[in-house]
Protein backbone atom coordinates (compact mmCIF):
# COMPACT_ATOMS: atom_id res chain seq x y z
CA UNK A 1 0.00 0.00 0.00
CA UNK A 2 1.08 3.53 -0.78
CA UNK A 3 -1.40 6.39 -0.49
CA UNK A 4 -0.60 10.05 0.11
CA UNK A 5 -3.75 11.66 -1.25
CA UNK A 6 -5.34 13.17 1.87
CA UNK A 7 -4.31 15.65 4.53
CA UNK A 8 -4.27 13.09 7.35
CA UNK A 9 -1.72 10.83 5.63
CA UNK A 10 1.09 9.51 7.80
CA UNK A 11 4.12 11.81 7.89
CA UNK A 12 7.53 10.64 9.08
CA UNK A 13 11.09 12.01 8.85
CA UNK A 14 11.85 9.48 6.10
CA UNK A 15 8.77 10.12 3.97
CA UNK A 16 5.05 10.74 3.77
CA UNK A 17 2.23 8.38 2.94
CA UNK A 18 0.19 5.53 4.37
CA UNK A 19 2.03 2.30 3.64
CA UNK A 20 0.88 -0.17 6.27
CA UNK A 21 -2.04 -2.58 6.65
CA UNK A 22 -4.50 0.28 6.90
CA UNK A 23 -4.46 3.96 6.04
CA UNK A 24 -5.37 6.76 8.40
CA UNK A 25 -8.77 7.01 6.71
CA UNK A 26 -9.57 3.38 7.50
CA UNK A 27 -8.90 2.14 3.96
CA UNK A 28 -7.23 -1.25 4.00
CA UNK A 29 -4.06 -1.97 2.08
CA UNK A 30 -6.12 -4.43 0.04
CA UNK A 31 -8.63 -1.81 -1.09
CA UNK A 32 -5.91 0.78 -1.67
CA UNK A 33 -3.88 -1.52 -3.91
CA UNK A 34 -6.97 -2.57 -5.86
CA UNK A 35 -7.78 1.10 -6.40
CA UNK A 36 -4.31 1.61 -7.89
CA UNK A 37 -5.03 -1.26 -10.28
CA UNK A 38 -8.40 0.28 -11.15
CA UNK A 39 -6.72 3.61 -11.94
CA UNK A 40 -4.33 1.86 -14.35
CA UNK A 41 -7.24 0.14 -16.11
CA UNK A 42 -9.10 3.46 -16.36
CA UNK A 43 -6.03 5.07 -17.93
CA UNK A 44 -6.13 2.42 -20.65
CA UNK A 45 -9.85 3.03 -21.14
CA UNK A 46 -9.19 6.74 -21.61
CA UNK A 47 -6.47 5.99 -24.16
CA UNK A 48 -9.04 4.11 -26.24
CA UNK A 49 -11.62 6.87 -25.74
CA UNK A 50 -9.11 9.28 -27.29
CA UNK A 51 -8.50 6.96 -30.24
CA UNK A 52 -12.26 6.64 -30.72
CA UNK A 53 -12.62 10.41 -30.86
CA UNK A 54 -9.99 10.53 -33.60
CA UNK A 55 -12.39 8.30 -35.54
CA UNK A 56 -15.42 10.47 -34.67
CA UNK A 57 -16.70 7.84 -32.24
CA UNK A 58 -18.00 9.13 -28.92
CA UNK A 59 -19.13 6.41 -26.53
CA UNK A 60 -21.34 8.00 -23.89
CA UNK A 61 -21.31 4.83 -21.80
CA UNK A 62 -17.55 5.18 -21.52
CA UNK A 63 -17.77 8.90 -20.82
CA UNK A 64 -20.37 8.39 -18.10
CA UNK A 65 -18.57 5.47 -16.48
CA UNK A 66 -14.93 6.60 -16.45
CA UNK A 67 -15.14 9.62 -14.10
CA UNK A 68 -17.62 7.80 -11.86
CA UNK A 69 -15.29 4.84 -11.39
CA UNK A 70 -12.35 7.20 -10.81
CA UNK A 71 -14.47 9.04 -8.21
CA UNK A 72 -14.71 5.78 -6.24
CA UNK A 73 -10.98 6.07 -5.45
CA UNK A 74 -11.26 9.44 -3.69
CA UNK A 75 -10.72 9.66 0.05
CA UNK A 76 -13.64 8.37 2.13
CA UNK A 77 -15.77 7.24 -0.80
CA UNK A 78 -15.54 3.49 -1.39
CA UNK A 79 -13.89 1.01 0.95
CA UNK A 80 -15.44 -2.12 -0.62
CA UNK A 81 -12.83 -4.20 -2.45
CA UNK A 82 -15.39 -6.22 -4.40
CA UNK A 83 -17.00 -3.07 -5.77
CA UNK A 84 -13.57 -1.76 -6.84
CA UNK A 85 -12.90 -5.02 -8.67
CA UNK A 86 -16.30 -4.72 -10.30
CA UNK A 87 -15.41 -1.26 -11.62
CA UNK A 88 -12.15 -2.61 -13.07
CA UNK A 89 -13.96 -5.48 -14.78
CA UNK A 90 -16.57 -3.13 -16.23
CA UNK A 91 -13.85 -0.77 -17.46
CA UNK A 92 -12.18 -3.60 -19.38
CA UNK A 93 -15.51 -4.68 -20.89
CA UNK A 94 -16.17 -1.12 -22.04
CA UNK A 95 -12.63 -0.76 -23.37
CA UNK A 96 -12.82 -3.94 -25.43
CA UNK A 97 -16.22 -2.99 -26.81
CA UNK A 98 -14.88 0.42 -27.79
CA UNK A 99 -11.83 -1.17 -29.42
CA UNK A 100 -14.13 -3.34 -31.54
CA UNK A 101 -16.06 -0.25 -32.65
CA UNK A 102 -12.82 1.49 -33.55
CA UNK A 103 -11.61 -1.48 -35.63
CA UNK A 104 -14.92 -1.72 -37.44
CA UNK A 105 -14.33 1.89 -38.46
CA UNK A 106 -10.63 1.38 -39.17
CA UNK A 107 -9.27 -2.17 -39.24
CA UNK A 108 -5.78 -0.91 -38.37
CA UNK A 109 -6.88 1.04 -35.29
CA UNK A 110 -4.54 0.50 -32.39
CA UNK A 111 -3.43 2.39 -29.29
CA UNK A 112 0.19 2.76 -28.27
CA UNK A 113 -0.24 3.11 -24.54
CA UNK A 114 1.16 1.01 -21.66
CA UNK A 115 -2.32 0.41 -20.20
CA UNK A 116 -4.26 0.01 -23.46
CA UNK A 117 -4.40 -3.79 -23.32
CA UNK A 118 -4.17 -4.30 -19.57
CA UNK A 119 -6.13 -7.37 -18.43
CA UNK A 120 -6.91 -8.47 -14.91
CA UNK A 121 -4.77 -11.44 -13.88
CA UNK A 122 -7.75 -13.16 -12.28
CA UNK A 123 -10.96 -12.66 -10.35
CA UNK A 124 -9.76 -13.49 -6.85
CA UNK A 125 -8.34 -10.87 -4.54
CA UNK A 126 -4.96 -12.55 -3.80
CA UNK A 127 -4.16 -12.80 -7.52
CA UNK A 128 -5.25 -9.24 -8.19
CA UNK A 129 -3.19 -7.94 -5.28
CA UNK A 130 -0.09 -9.56 -6.76
CA UNK A 131 -0.85 -7.80 -10.04
CA UNK A 132 -1.63 -4.50 -8.32
CA UNK A 133 1.89 -4.36 -6.90
CA UNK A 134 3.11 -3.48 -10.40
CA UNK A 135 0.92 -0.36 -10.40
CA UNK A 136 1.74 1.07 -6.98
CA UNK A 137 1.87 4.85 -7.21
CA UNK A 138 5.38 4.95 -5.77
CA UNK A 139 6.77 2.10 -7.88
CA UNK A 140 9.37 4.27 -9.65
CA UNK A 141 9.64 7.09 -7.13
CA UNK A 142 13.25 6.23 -6.32
CA UNK A 143 14.09 6.53 -10.03
CA UNK A 144 12.24 9.72 -11.01
CA UNK A 145 12.77 11.55 -7.72
CA UNK A 146 10.47 13.15 -5.19
CA UNK A 147 9.69 16.28 -7.22
CA UNK A 148 8.49 14.42 -10.32
CA UNK A 149 6.57 11.97 -8.19
CA UNK A 150 4.96 14.82 -6.28
CA UNK A 151 3.89 16.55 -9.49
CA UNK A 152 2.42 13.31 -10.81
CA UNK A 153 0.37 13.04 -7.65
CA UNK A 154 -0.71 16.68 -7.94
CA UNK A 155 -2.05 15.92 -11.42
CA UNK A 156 -3.58 12.58 -10.48
CA UNK A 157 -5.31 13.85 -7.36
CA UNK A 158 -6.43 17.03 -9.08
CA UNK A 159 -7.95 14.97 -11.88
CA UNK A 160 -9.69 12.79 -9.29
CA UNK A 161 -11.33 15.88 -7.86
CA UNK A 162 -12.43 17.02 -11.33
CA UNK A 163 -13.83 13.54 -12.03
CA UNK A 164 -15.96 13.81 -8.89
CA UNK A 165 -17.45 17.09 -10.07
CA UNK A 166 -17.99 15.61 -13.54
CA UNK A 167 -20.02 12.82 -11.96
CA UNK A 168 -22.06 15.28 -9.89
CA UNK A 169 -22.80 17.23 -13.09
CA UNK A 170 -23.61 14.05 -15.03
CA UNK A 171 -26.20 13.03 -12.44
CA UNK A 172 -27.94 16.33 -13.18
CA UNK A 173 -27.93 15.67 -16.92
CA UNK A 174 -25.00 17.92 -17.78
CA UNK A 175 -22.56 16.88 -20.50
CA UNK A 176 -19.90 18.75 -22.44
CA UNK A 177 -17.91 16.72 -24.94
CA UNK A 178 -14.95 19.09 -24.79
CA UNK A 179 -14.61 18.46 -21.06
CA UNK A 180 -14.72 14.69 -21.48
CA UNK A 181 -12.17 14.82 -24.29
CA UNK A 182 -9.84 16.80 -22.02
CA UNK A 183 -10.44 14.42 -19.14
CA UNK A 184 -9.51 11.38 -21.24
CA UNK A 185 -6.41 13.17 -22.56
CA UNK A 186 -5.16 13.97 -19.06
CA UNK A 187 -6.02 10.50 -17.76
CA UNK A 188 -4.29 8.69 -20.62
CA UNK A 189 -1.25 10.99 -20.34
CA UNK A 190 -0.88 10.17 -16.65
CA UNK A 191 -0.80 6.49 -17.57
CA UNK A 192 2.42 7.07 -19.54
CA UNK A 193 4.29 7.97 -16.33
CA UNK A 194 5.31 11.49 -17.47
CA UNK A 195 8.49 12.90 -15.96
CA UNK A 196 9.06 16.34 -17.49
CA UNK A 197 8.64 18.90 -14.70
CA UNK A 198 7.45 21.76 -16.92
CA UNK A 199 4.85 19.58 -18.63
CA UNK A 200 3.64 18.28 -15.29
CA UNK A 201 3.26 21.81 -13.93
CA UNK A 202 1.52 23.06 -17.07
CA UNK A 203 -0.88 20.14 -17.17
CA UNK A 204 -1.75 20.60 -13.51
CA UNK A 205 -2.88 24.10 -14.46
CA UNK A 206 -4.70 22.60 -17.44
CA UNK A 207 -6.63 20.30 -15.12
CA UNK A 208 -7.52 23.34 -13.03
CA UNK A 209 -8.82 25.21 -16.08
CA UNK A 210 -10.84 22.19 -17.16
CA UNK A 211 -12.34 21.98 -13.71
CA UNK A 212 -13.56 25.58 -13.93
CA UNK A 213 -15.67 24.48 -16.89
CA UNK A 214 -16.82 21.41 -14.96
CA UNK A 215 -17.95 23.60 -12.05
CA UNK A 216 -19.77 25.84 -14.53
CA UNK A 217 -21.89 22.99 -15.92
CA UNK A 218 -22.46 21.67 -12.40
CA UNK A 219 -23.66 25.11 -11.33
CA UNK A 220 -25.96 25.17 -14.36
CA UNK A 221 -27.29 21.71 -13.55
CA UNK A 222 -28.10 22.62 -9.96
CA UNK A 223 -29.69 25.98 -10.69
CA UNK A 224 -31.67 24.71 -13.69
CA UNK A 225 -33.08 21.88 -11.59
CA UNK A 226 -33.60 23.57 -8.24
CA UNK A 227 -33.50 27.34 -8.87
CA UNK A 228 -30.97 29.90 -7.72
CA UNK A 229 -30.15 29.63 -4.00
CA UNK A 230 -31.78 32.23 -1.77
CA UNK A 231 -30.73 33.33 1.72
CA UNK A 232 -32.57 30.92 4.00
CA UNK A 233 -32.64 30.34 7.75
CA UNK A 234 -31.93 26.72 8.70
CA UNK A 235 -32.61 25.09 12.05
CA UNK A 236 -29.63 23.10 13.33
CA UNK A 237 -31.55 21.47 16.17
CA UNK A 238 -33.82 18.42 15.73
CA UNK A 239 -37.59 18.38 16.02
CA UNK A 240 -39.80 15.58 17.33
CA UNK A 241 -40.54 12.79 14.87
CA UNK A 242 -39.16 10.04 12.67
CA UNK A 243 -36.01 10.98 10.81
CA UNK A 244 -33.70 10.31 7.87
CA UNK A 245 -30.28 11.94 7.60
CA UNK A 246 -28.81 12.48 4.13
CA UNK A 247 -25.14 13.32 3.62
CA UNK A 248 -22.85 13.96 0.68
CA UNK A 249 -23.29 16.25 -2.32
CA UNK A 250 -26.03 14.73 -4.49
CA UNK A 251 -28.98 17.13 -4.54
CA UNK A 252 -30.86 14.86 -6.94
CA UNK A 253 -30.89 12.09 -4.34
CA UNK A 254 -32.17 14.58 -1.78
CA UNK A 255 -34.96 15.69 -4.12
CA UNK A 256 -36.06 12.09 -4.73
CA UNK A 257 -35.96 11.34 -1.01
CA UNK A 258 -38.05 14.42 -0.23
CA UNK A 259 -40.63 13.44 -2.84
CA UNK A 260 -40.86 9.87 -1.60
CA UNK A 261 -41.15 10.83 2.08
CA UNK A 262 -43.76 13.54 1.59
CA UNK A 263 -46.79 12.73 3.72
CA UNK A 264 -45.09 9.81 5.50
CA UNK A 265 -44.39 11.67 8.73
CA UNK A 266 -40.64 11.23 8.27
CA UNK A 267 -38.51 14.37 8.58
CA UNK A 268 -35.41 14.83 6.44
CA UNK A 269 -32.21 16.32 7.84
CA UNK A 270 -29.16 17.36 5.86
CA UNK A 271 -25.62 16.61 6.96
CA UNK A 272 -22.25 17.96 5.89
CA UNK A 273 -22.14 19.26 2.34
CA UNK A 274 -25.92 18.84 1.99
CA UNK A 275 -26.44 21.96 4.14
CA UNK A 276 -26.61 24.36 1.14
CA UNK A 277 -29.62 22.41 -0.18
CA UNK A 278 -31.83 24.43 2.16
CA UNK A 279 -31.27 27.52 0.00
CA UNK A 280 -32.61 26.04 -3.26
CA UNK A 281 -36.28 27.01 -3.92
CA UNK A 282 -37.22 23.61 -5.36
CA UNK A 283 -35.84 21.82 -2.31
CA UNK A 284 -36.73 24.13 0.56
CA UNK A 285 -40.40 24.10 -0.49
CA UNK A 286 -40.72 20.67 1.14
CA UNK A 287 -42.04 21.30 4.65
CA UNK A 288 -40.46 18.13 6.05
CA UNK A 289 -36.94 19.27 5.13
CA UNK A 290 -36.56 19.85 8.84
CA UNK A 291 -33.03 21.16 9.25
CA UNK A 292 -29.35 20.35 9.40
CA UNK A 293 -27.87 17.84 11.83
CA UNK A 294 -24.33 17.46 13.09
CA UNK A 295 -21.05 19.10 12.22
CA UNK A 296 -17.96 18.19 10.20
CA UNK A 297 -17.73 14.76 8.57
CA UNK A 298 -14.97 13.68 10.96
CA UNK A 299 -17.45 13.69 13.87
CA UNK A 300 -19.93 11.33 12.23
CA UNK A 301 -19.05 8.26 14.28
CA UNK A 302 -20.30 10.05 17.39
CA UNK A 303 -23.10 12.06 15.80
CA UNK A 304 -24.50 9.28 13.60
CA UNK A 305 -24.52 6.93 16.58
CA UNK A 306 -26.86 9.39 18.32
CA UNK A 307 -29.10 9.96 15.30
CA UNK A 308 -32.32 7.97 15.90
CA UNK A 309 -33.12 7.23 12.28
CA UNK A 310 -31.81 5.97 8.95
CA UNK A 311 -28.77 7.53 7.25
CA UNK A 312 -28.03 7.87 3.52
CA UNK A 313 -24.55 8.58 2.15
CA UNK A 314 -24.72 9.94 -1.41
CA UNK A 315 -21.01 10.67 -1.93
CA UNK A 316 -17.98 11.38 0.21
CA UNK A 317 -17.38 11.33 3.16
CA UNK A 318 -18.05 7.97 4.85
CA UNK A 319 -15.92 6.53 7.64
CA UNK A 320 -16.21 3.22 9.51
CA UNK A 321 -19.85 2.94 10.69
CA UNK A 322 -19.07 -0.03 12.90
CA UNK A 323 -17.21 2.18 15.38
CA UNK A 324 -20.47 3.86 16.37
CA UNK A 325 -22.50 0.67 15.92
CA UNK A 326 -24.85 2.19 13.33
CA UNK A 327 -23.76 0.05 10.37
CA UNK A 328 -27.25 -1.44 10.14
CA UNK A 329 -28.81 2.03 9.79
CA UNK A 330 -26.57 3.50 7.11
CA UNK A 331 -27.20 3.15 3.38
CA UNK A 332 -24.74 3.92 0.58
CA UNK A 333 -25.58 5.27 -2.86
CA UNK A 334 -23.86 5.48 -6.24
CA UNK A 335 -20.07 5.25 -5.89
CA UNK A 336 -20.09 5.08 -2.07
CA UNK A 337 -19.28 1.76 -0.44
CA UNK A 338 -18.42 0.13 2.85
CA UNK A 339 -18.19 -3.67 3.27
CA UNK A 340 -21.33 -5.15 4.84
CA UNK A 341 -23.37 -1.93 4.59
CA UNK A 342 -26.66 -1.81 2.67
CA UNK A 343 -26.20 -0.34 -0.81
CA UNK A 344 -29.27 1.22 -2.40
CA UNK A 345 -29.51 0.55 -6.14
CA UNK A 346 -32.00 2.41 -8.29
CA UNK A 347 -34.11 5.34 -7.20
CA UNK A 348 -36.53 3.66 -4.79
CA UNK A 349 -35.84 4.80 -1.22
CA UNK A 350 -38.60 2.61 0.26
CA UNK A 351 -36.22 0.41 2.30
CA UNK A 352 -34.69 3.50 3.91
CA UNK A 353 -38.09 5.05 4.61
CA UNK A 354 -39.44 1.82 6.10
CA UNK A 355 -36.41 1.55 8.35
CA UNK A 356 -36.80 5.16 9.50
CA UNK A 357 -40.45 4.52 10.36
CA UNK A 358 -39.44 1.51 12.46
CA UNK A 359 -36.87 3.49 14.46
CA UNK A 360 -37.52 5.74 17.46
CA UNK A 361 -36.95 9.13 15.87
CA UNK A 362 -36.42 12.23 17.99
CA UNK A 363 -38.61 12.17 21.13
CA UNK A 364 -38.94 15.94 21.44
CA UNK A 365 -38.08 19.20 19.69
CA UNK A 366 -35.05 21.11 20.89
CA UNK A 367 -34.97 24.90 21.09
CA UNK A 368 -34.31 26.26 17.61
CA UNK A 369 -30.89 27.54 16.60
CA UNK A 370 -31.00 29.15 13.17
CA UNK A 371 -28.14 29.77 10.76
CA UNK A 372 -28.38 31.29 7.28
CA UNK A 373 -27.32 29.68 4.01
CA UNK A 374 -28.08 30.36 0.36
CA UNK A 375 -25.71 33.15 -0.70
CA UNK A 376 -25.29 31.68 -4.16
CA UNK A 377 -24.07 33.22 -7.38
CA UNK A 378 -27.12 35.36 -8.21
CA UNK A 379 -27.50 36.63 -4.65
CA UNK A 380 -23.81 37.53 -4.51
CA UNK A 381 -23.91 39.29 -7.87
CA UNK A 382 -26.98 41.28 -6.83
CA UNK A 383 -24.96 42.59 -3.87
CA UNK A 384 -21.92 43.56 -5.96
CA UNK A 385 -22.83 47.25 -6.24
CA UNK A 386 -23.52 47.44 -2.50
CA UNK A 387 -20.12 45.92 -1.77
CA UNK A 388 -18.42 48.39 -4.12
CA UNK A 389 -20.21 51.33 -2.48
CA UNK A 390 -19.21 50.15 0.99
CA UNK A 391 -15.59 49.83 -0.12
CA UNK A 392 -15.69 53.33 -1.64
CA UNK A 393 -17.15 54.74 1.58
CA UNK A 394 -14.43 52.93 3.55
CA UNK A 395 -17.11 51.10 5.50
CA UNK A 396 -15.93 47.74 4.14
CA UNK A 397 -12.20 47.18 4.48
CA UNK A 398 -11.71 43.61 3.29
CA UNK A 399 -13.47 40.39 2.29
CA UNK A 400 -12.12 37.04 3.42
CA UNK A 401 -13.03 33.73 1.80
CA UNK A 402 -12.45 31.18 4.56
CA UNK A 403 -13.49 27.71 3.50
CA UNK A 404 -12.55 24.30 2.23
CA UNK A 405 -12.47 20.90 3.85
CA UNK A 406 -12.80 20.06 7.52
CA UNK A 407 -10.84 17.35 9.31
CA UNK A 408 -9.76 16.09 12.69
CA UNK A 409 -6.34 17.71 13.04
CA UNK A 410 -6.18 20.03 16.08
CA UNK A 411 -4.49 22.74 14.03
CA UNK A 412 -7.79 23.30 12.22
CA UNK A 413 -8.89 25.42 15.17
CA UNK A 414 -6.87 28.09 13.31
CA UNK A 415 -9.84 28.64 11.00
CA UNK A 416 -12.23 29.20 13.89
CA UNK A 417 -9.82 31.62 15.51
CA UNK A 418 -9.19 33.38 12.21
CA UNK A 419 -12.87 34.15 11.61
CA UNK A 420 -13.30 35.33 15.20
CA UNK A 421 -10.42 37.75 14.68
CA UNK A 422 -11.69 39.20 11.40
CA UNK A 423 -12.28 42.93 12.08
CA UNK A 424 -15.87 44.15 12.30
CA UNK A 425 -15.52 46.20 9.11
CA UNK A 426 -14.81 43.06 7.06
CA UNK A 427 -16.98 40.34 5.52
CA UNK A 428 -16.43 36.58 5.56
CA UNK A 429 -17.51 34.30 2.74
CA UNK A 430 -17.39 30.57 3.31
CA UNK A 431 -18.02 27.35 1.45
CA UNK A 432 -17.57 23.58 1.79
CA UNK A 433 -17.53 21.65 5.06
CA UNK A 434 -14.73 23.72 6.61
CA UNK A 435 -17.52 26.18 7.52
CA UNK A 436 -18.58 23.89 10.36
CA UNK A 437 -15.63 25.25 12.30
CA UNK A 438 -17.50 28.55 12.72
CA UNK A 439 -20.89 28.62 10.95
CA UNK A 440 -22.94 28.38 14.14
CA UNK A 441 -21.31 31.52 15.57
CA UNK A 442 -22.99 34.92 15.35
CA UNK A 443 -20.91 37.36 13.31
CA UNK A 444 -23.57 40.06 13.13
CA UNK A 445 -24.04 42.42 10.19
CA UNK A 446 -22.18 45.18 8.36
CA UNK A 447 -24.38 47.96 6.98
CA UNK A 448 -27.23 45.49 6.62
CA UNK A 449 -25.15 42.69 5.08
CA UNK A 450 -24.55 39.51 7.11
CA UNK A 451 -20.86 39.39 7.94
CA UNK A 452 -20.85 35.63 7.30
CA UNK A 453 -22.02 34.65 3.82
CA UNK A 454 -22.39 30.90 3.19
CA UNK A 455 -21.77 30.47 -0.54
CA UNK A 456 -22.50 26.73 -0.62
CA UNK A 457 -20.76 23.44 -1.34
CA UNK A 458 -17.10 23.11 -2.29
CA UNK A 459 -17.96 23.29 -6.00
CA UNK A 460 -19.68 26.63 -5.35
CA UNK A 461 -16.20 28.11 -5.38
CA UNK A 462 -17.40 28.81 -8.92
CA UNK A 463 -19.84 31.39 -7.53
CA UNK A 464 -17.10 33.08 -5.51
CA UNK A 465 -14.86 33.22 -8.59
CA UNK A 466 -17.63 34.75 -10.70
CA UNK A 467 -18.28 37.36 -7.99
CA UNK A 468 -14.58 38.24 -7.80
CA UNK A 469 -14.36 38.64 -11.58
CA UNK A 470 -17.50 40.83 -11.61
CA UNK A 471 -16.19 43.05 -8.82
CA UNK A 472 -12.86 43.41 -10.59
CA UNK A 473 -14.61 44.40 -13.82
CA UNK A 474 -16.73 47.01 -12.06
CA UNK A 475 -13.72 48.44 -10.25
CA UNK A 476 -11.50 48.35 -13.33
CA UNK A 477 -8.81 46.25 -11.69
CA UNK A 478 -7.53 42.68 -11.59
CA UNK A 479 -8.87 40.03 -9.23
CA UNK A 480 -5.60 40.12 -7.29
CA UNK A 481 -6.05 43.86 -6.71
CA UNK A 482 -9.37 43.41 -4.91
CA UNK A 483 -9.59 43.73 -1.11
CA UNK A 484 -10.13 39.97 -1.09
CA UNK A 485 -8.06 37.20 0.49
CA UNK A 486 -8.49 33.44 0.33
CA UNK A 487 -7.72 31.34 3.40
CA UNK A 488 -8.38 27.73 2.47
CA UNK A 489 -8.37 24.46 4.38
CA UNK A 490 -7.83 21.26 2.45
CA UNK A 491 -8.34 17.58 3.13
CA UNK A 492 -8.88 15.65 -0.08
CA UNK A 493 -8.83 15.70 -3.85
CA UNK A 494 -11.75 18.03 -4.53
CA UNK A 495 -9.88 20.70 -2.57
CA UNK A 496 -6.75 20.00 -4.61
CA UNK A 497 -8.53 20.58 -7.92
CA UNK A 498 -10.22 23.75 -6.66
CA UNK A 499 -6.80 25.05 -5.67
CA UNK A 500 -5.52 24.19 -9.16
CA UNK A 501 -8.52 25.99 -10.64
CA UNK A 502 -7.78 29.13 -8.67
CA UNK A 503 -4.09 29.04 -9.57
CA UNK A 504 -4.87 28.40 -13.24
CA UNK A 505 -7.04 31.52 -13.24
CA UNK A 506 -4.15 33.57 -11.90
CA UNK A 507 -5.41 33.99 -8.34
CA UNK A 508 -2.44 34.72 -6.10
CA UNK A 509 -1.45 34.91 -2.44
CA UNK A 510 -3.71 32.09 -1.27
CA UNK A 511 -3.20 30.91 2.30
CA UNK A 512 -3.58 27.14 2.76
CA UNK A 513 -3.57 24.77 5.70
CA UNK A 514 -3.55 23.21 8.16
CA UNK A 515 -0.56 21.42 6.59
CA UNK A 516 0.93 21.21 3.12
CA UNK A 517 -0.07 18.19 1.00
CA UNK A 518 2.22 15.30 1.85
CA UNK A 519 3.09 14.72 -1.80
CA UNK A 520 4.43 18.25 -2.36
CA UNK A 521 8.14 18.56 -1.68
CA UNK A 522 9.82 21.67 -0.32
CA UNK A 523 11.03 22.38 -3.86
CA UNK A 524 7.51 22.21 -5.27
CA UNK A 525 6.08 24.36 -2.49
CA UNK A 526 8.79 26.93 -3.22
CA UNK A 527 7.83 26.92 -6.92
CA UNK A 528 4.15 27.46 -6.07
CA UNK A 529 5.10 30.26 -3.72
CA UNK A 530 7.31 31.93 -6.31
CA UNK A 531 4.82 31.63 -9.18
CA UNK A 532 1.58 32.23 -7.30
CA UNK A 533 2.43 33.58 -3.87
CA UNK A 534 0.80 30.49 -2.34
CA UNK A 535 1.79 30.16 1.29
CA UNK A 536 1.12 28.09 4.36
CA UNK A 537 -0.84 29.52 7.26
CA UNK A 538 1.25 30.54 10.28
CA UNK A 539 -0.53 32.18 13.21
CA UNK A 540 -3.83 34.02 13.08
CA UNK A 541 -2.26 37.26 14.27
CA UNK A 542 0.65 37.16 11.84
CA UNK A 543 -1.48 36.18 8.83
CA UNK A 544 -4.19 38.73 9.61
CA UNK A 545 -1.65 41.52 9.98
CA UNK A 546 0.10 40.55 6.74
CA UNK A 547 -3.16 40.46 4.78
CA UNK A 548 -4.55 43.74 6.07
CA UNK A 549 -1.24 45.54 5.66
CA UNK A 550 -0.94 44.58 1.99
Swiss-Prot record:
UniProt-listed Enzyme Commission number(s): 1.7.99.1
InterPro entries given in the database record: HCP/CODH (IPR004137), Hydroxylam_reduct (IPR010048), Prismane-like_a/b-sand (IPR016099), Prismane-like_sf (IPR011254), Prismane_a-bundle (IPR016100)
Annotated residues for binding of hybrid [4Fe-2O-2S] cluster: 249, 273, 317, 405, 433, 458, 492, 494
Cofactor annotation remark: Binds 1 [2Fe-2S] cluster.
Listed cofactors: [2Fe-2S] cluster; hybrid [4Fe-2O-2S] cluster
Top-rank lineage group of the source organism: Bacteria
Pfam families the record matches: Prismane (PF03063)
Modified residue annotations for Cysteine persulfide: 405
GO annotation, cellular component aspect: cytoplasm
Molecular function GO labels: 2 iron, 2 sulfur cluster binding; hydroxylamine reductase activity; metal ion binding; peroxidase activity
Annotated catalysed reactions: A + NH4(+) + H2O = hydroxylamine + AH2 + H(+)
Subcellular localization(s) per the UniProt record: Cytoplasm
Gene Ontology biological process: response to hydrogen peroxide
Function per UniProt: Catalyzes the reduction of hydroxylamine to form NH(3) and H(2)O.
Family: Belongs to the HCP family.
Protein's UniProt name: Hydroxylamine reductase
Species for this entry: Pectobacterium carotovorum subsp. carotovorum (strain PC1)
Phylogenetic placement of the source organism: Bacteria, Pseudomonadati, Pseudomonadota, Gammaproteobacteria, Enterobacterales
Amino acid sequence: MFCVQCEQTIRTPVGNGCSYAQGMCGKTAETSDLQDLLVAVLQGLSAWALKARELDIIDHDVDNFAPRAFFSTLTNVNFDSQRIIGYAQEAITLRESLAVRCRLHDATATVDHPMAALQLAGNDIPTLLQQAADFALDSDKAIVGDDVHGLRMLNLYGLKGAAAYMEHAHVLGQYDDAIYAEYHAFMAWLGTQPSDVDTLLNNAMGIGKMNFNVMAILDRGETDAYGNPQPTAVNVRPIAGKAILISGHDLKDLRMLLEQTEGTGVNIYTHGEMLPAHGYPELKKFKHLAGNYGSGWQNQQTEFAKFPGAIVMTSNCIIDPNVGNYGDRIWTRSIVGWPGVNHLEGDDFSPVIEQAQSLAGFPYSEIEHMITVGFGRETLLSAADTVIDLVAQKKLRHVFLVGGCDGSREERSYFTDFTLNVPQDCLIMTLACGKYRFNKLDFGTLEGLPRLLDVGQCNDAYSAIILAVKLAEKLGCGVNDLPLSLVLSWFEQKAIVILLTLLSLGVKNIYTGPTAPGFLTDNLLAILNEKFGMRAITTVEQDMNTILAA
